[in-house]
A protein has these predicted regions:
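Compositionally biased low-complexity segments enriched in polar/charged residues
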Residues: 11-26, 37-43, 62, 84, ...
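Long, well-structured alpha-helical subdomains associated
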Residues: 22, 28-32, 151-231
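Zn2+-dependent metallopeptidase catalytic core
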Residues: 25-59
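Catalytic phosphate/metal-binding cores of nucleic-acid and nucleotide-processing enzymes, i.e., regions
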Residues: 117, 122-125, 131-138, 181
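Amphipathic, interaction-prone secondary-structure segments
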Residues: 49-83
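Active-site scaffold of zinc-dependent metalloenzymes
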Residues: 71-113, 122-129
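Post-HEXXH active-site segment of zinc metalloproteases
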Residues: 112, 128-162
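Proteolytic processing junctions in secreted/extracellular precursors
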Residues: 3-9, 38, 150
């Protein structure tokens, strides 16, 4: 599929995969709660990682890894990366940021963040399917291009601009943004006036830190967002 065709074809998350993962997450949250009750309510994110991975009895293409390094954003509990190789196919890696989760973890918030993030990453999976192996073998994402640019003397902002202007990311982040809008007090107004709700829309705010409101990237983001919002 050519890029312009991909841009016209909105991808959806892999609902079958998400349903299977949700069962794993629900079981793991219950098991981790038992661990907390037996350990004076003191978080151990390595234990949470172990529980999540051990409950993946069907060996779904996902792995949870605890990251003990500090993050720039103290509220970033989780990050995830979708990948594809010709040998292994599609896969997603989820990083649990221990320093941010310890003492802050809550089961409902954890699940909401994780499932939304996996929705984002499985949109990438479906994009990969449409692109095909021939394209993927030589494809460089916006993030990869940004890393190259930064290594050549660019800035963190250059990297982020390259990452967020990637058409694949615009689509996947639009799905996230639609979900955030639906959680506001007035979802329809948030869709019409996202500037008014910037404080409640982390995805929109992230893009606004890089792009002006009338930019091509913001317009495309909001176009996809409206489609996801109404679906």
């Amino acid at each position: 599929m050519r890029l312009h065709e991909l841009l016209e074809a909105r991808m959806e998350p892999d609902q079958n995969f998400l349903a299977q993962i949700e069962e794993i997450v629900d079981d793991s949250i219950d098991e981790y709660q038992e661990f907390l009750e037996e350990n004076n309510d003191v978080d151990d994110i390595d234990e949470l990682e172990s529980i999540l991975n051990s409950n993946n009895v069907d060996e779904l293409p996902i792995e949870f890894i605890t990251d003990h390094n500090p993050r720039k954003d103290p509220d970033e509990w989780i990050s995830a990366v979708a990948d594809w190789t010709e040998k292994e196919g599609k896969f997603v890696t989820v990083y649990l940021h221990a320093k941010n989760l310890e003492g802050a973890y809550g089961p409902k918030t954890f699940k909401n963040i994780l499932m939304r993030m996996l929705g984002h990453e499985t949109i990438h999976w479906n994009q990969y399917d449409k692109m095909g192996a021939k394209v993927l073998n030589t494809y460089k994402s916006g993030y990869q291009k940004g890393v190259i640019k930064k290594a050549a003397g660019g800035t963190d902002r250059d990297l982020m601009r390259s990452y967020l202007r990637d058409p694949h990311e615009l689509m996947a982040y639009a799905h996230d943004l639609a979900g955030e809008m639906k959680e506001t007090e007035n979802p329809e107004d948030a869709l019409r006036n996202p500037e008014k709700y910037k404080a409640e829309l982390p995805v929109y705010n992230r893009f606004r830190e890089i792009f002006p409101p009338n930019s091509k990237q913001l317009r495309q983001l909001l176009k996809y967002t409206a489609d996801y919002f109404k679906s």
